[in-house]
Amino acid sequence: MIRSIFKKNSSLPYFLKRSFITKPHSIITPIINNNNHNNNNINTPIKNIQSFNFKFFTTTTTSNPIHQQTTTTTTTTPSTEQQQLSKEAEEINENITKYNITLTDSCVKELNSVQKKSDSTDIFLRVMVDMGGCSGYQYIIKVENKLQDDDVLFIRNGAKVIIDKISLEMMEGSIIDYETALMRSSFVVASNPNTIKSCGCKISFELKK
């Protein structure tokens, strides 16, 4: 395209014609030789065209292949309520490990059923040891909706069992179950390694000395 501008009869010198036959992206910058150009006479025509030196500069755009990536790390601080729930869960796990209290599947199922039928979401099965019965001690098992200060909480799949600390000294390692019988269905302490014997009703027992 640039070649077509300069015809054979053009009055421009030949070297100028060649100067314009360059790459399309070249920039032609004339450098005036101050020795041949009189700055005092601006209107004087430049006769010696060879006093112009032409330099060609090519503009190149270089892209950096390395792109810096900014990684934003979001740190979420648990709320006070979440921290409290987490702390309670840790305490419950410690209780299960420390006292080795087992809640059977039937116990969990029945206790969850009782909780669904109740208006309160806080339903606990209290198991405690009291003096009495035919063997000297007896279990008292009942459903409550309040925790006492000395209660230790055990939870499995939503079922909550509470045992006071004094009773736990005589019940460590016990298994709490729900038994269904023809005459009577109830929560029972199915096994207690701290006892010597228990009566057939599984309510009264004798402790090891």
From Swiss-Prot:
The entry's keywords: Iron, Iron-sulfur, Metal-binding, Mitochondrion, Transit peptide
Gene3D superfamilies, per database record: HesB-like domain
UniProt keyword annotation of Metal-binding present: yes
Cofactor: Fe cation
Keyword Mitochondrion among record annotations: yes
Subcellular location: Mitochondrion
Pfam families reported in the protein's UniProt record: Fe-S_biosyn
Residues at which Fe cation binds: 134, 199, 201
Range of residues in the leader sequence: none
Source taxon at top rank: Eukaryota
Gene Ontology, cellular component aspect: mitochondrion
One BP annotation, GO: iron-sulfur cluster assembly
GO molecular function: 2 iron, 2 sulfur cluster binding; 4 iron, 4 sulfur cluster binding; iron ion binding
Transit pept. (range): 1-27
Segments crossing the lipid bilayer: none
Cofactor annotation remark: Binds 2 iron ions per dimer.
Family indicated by similarity: Belongs to the HesB/IscA family.
Its biological purpose: Involved in the maturation of mitochondrial 4Fe-4S proteins functioning late in the iron-sulfur cluster assembly pathway. May be involved in the binding of an intermediate of Fe/S cluster assembly.
Record's protein name: Iron-sulfur cluster assembly 2 homolog, mitochondrial
Organism: Dictyostelium discoideum
Gene encoding the protein: isca2
